[in-house]
């Protein structure tokens, strides 16, 4: 009942706004296509809830996740920026901070010979936009962490004329 009456009220509101917008647009001679798009976006913005739920205190979620407590409480994580891929010249993947967990016990699977582990978090890598976000997430979950600072490469000064200098070993004679 409430959903039906809400949609009727929303529909009436949109028709009223459209009538007002059509009256305003007929004077300024703007195409009606932009009117429909803007009215639809306005209706979308009204229906979406932009409230965020924040929890200030640390909650114990070990019973909800199903992960054993020894895997959650005694973790050590590494926070770092990944190195640039040597196969490409771009630096797009070096903008985010990554968090990966320490390696726990592993063993060789006797059937297939694969490396096995009982740790559900060992292969998980989390991505953060800033180092502070990663540190606060680790502190919120009670994990100890190591931070590897971003390595900024020093640019080497090169000149085109150095390729043709006679006192360097850049030219190889054939004799």
Curated annotation (Swiss-Prot):
Residues 151-175 are annotated as: Disordered. The keyword Electron transport applies. Keywords: Disease variant, Electron transport, Membrane, Mitochondrion, Mitochondrion inner membrane, Phosphoprotein, Primary mitochondrial disease, Respiratory chain, Transit peptide, Transport. Changing residue 173 to A: Loss of phosphorylation. The keyword Transit peptide applies. One of its GO terms (biological process) is aerobic respiration. Accessory subunit of the mitochondrial membrane respiratory chain NADH dehydrogenase (Complex I), that is believed not to be involved in catalysis. Complex I functions in the transfer of electrons from NADH to the respiratory chain. The immediate electron acceptor for the enzyme is believed to be ubiquinone. InterPro entries: NADH_UbQ_FeS_4_mit-like, NDUFS4-like_sf. Pfam families: NDUS4. This is NADH dehydrogenase [ubiquinone] iron-sulfur protein 4, mitochondrial.
